[in-house]
Amino acid sequence: MDGKVMIEEYIRTLKRKGFGGMLVSDHDSYDGYREWKNAIKGRAHQDFVVLKGVEYDTCDCGHILVIMPFGVKLKILELRGLPGSILVKIVHAYGGILGPAHPYGEKFMSMISTNERKKKYQQRIAQLLPQFDFVEIFNACESAETNAKAKRLAEKFNKPGFGGSDAHRLDCIGKAYTELPDTIRSEDNLIAYVKTCPQIDCGGEHYNGTTKDRIGRLNMVLVDSFYFYNKLANGWRWRKRRRELFDIIEKKL
């Protein structure tokens, strides 16, 4: 989940489709999960599990999904722009797990696609890939070809796979699934399970209502503009990110 649909609408829609829970993973923000925690949790939908995650925008590895243990709060995970190598160290130092989202998706947003265009990063990425805990191998907004490549990547490094709907719009909710035991009721449960499970069943159906489906070749202009937006956003948050990073280094790294 990283769209603008209200979080309770996600829950209602997923429950109607037979889902028992979801991972909330907004881009560089926990606002969606906060809405659940502050306004809904304990009051409604107590038969539905909502877990906390984030889709972090790195400066060199595209989008990375991050899940931290219950109670761990790091402001830096809402300040986009860290290098992938630093993000891995921070997440693991605090007991979390992480993995690339849609690794063969759009350039600048996806780990492999980003770095295929930057030969100087290839060795760095080769060193980084084994350190991830999982790979998103099915994304409902990606093609069968790119999802197949992501699955082969996970198999190469013996990593479990996740499925994600990447639902920015209401009609995309529930297009993908990840099969998990009913015993997983918290982030800690999920982290422990992923660390000990080499294979996780996941999949879904392709969603053909994405922006790139609707505007065709013009989508490349949008993707290129994202590159400049990402650079500006990273620079804007540089001071805050540096301050948070120094604090983490003193405590953990």
Give the positions of each predicted feature:
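Domain-core and long-helix interface of multi-subunit machines
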Residues: 1-2, 71-175, 214-217
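C-terminal functional module detector
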Residues: 87-96, 149-160, 165-253
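Short, basic, helix/turn surface patches
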Residues: 48-57, 129-134, 185-200
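Beta-strand-turn-beta hairpins that frame and shape the catalytic cleft
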Residues: 46, 59-64, 93-96
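Short, hinge-like loop/turn segments at secondary-structure boundaries
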Residues: 39-43, 67-70, 115-119, 178-182
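An N-terminally biased module of ancient metal coordination in phosphate/nucleic-acid-related enzymes
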Residues: 1-59, 81, 248-252
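A basic- and aromatic-enriched beta-loop-alpha substructure that forms the phosphate/nucleotide-
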Residues: 57-74
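Short glycine-enriched loops at secondary-structure junctions
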Residues: 54-60, 104, 167
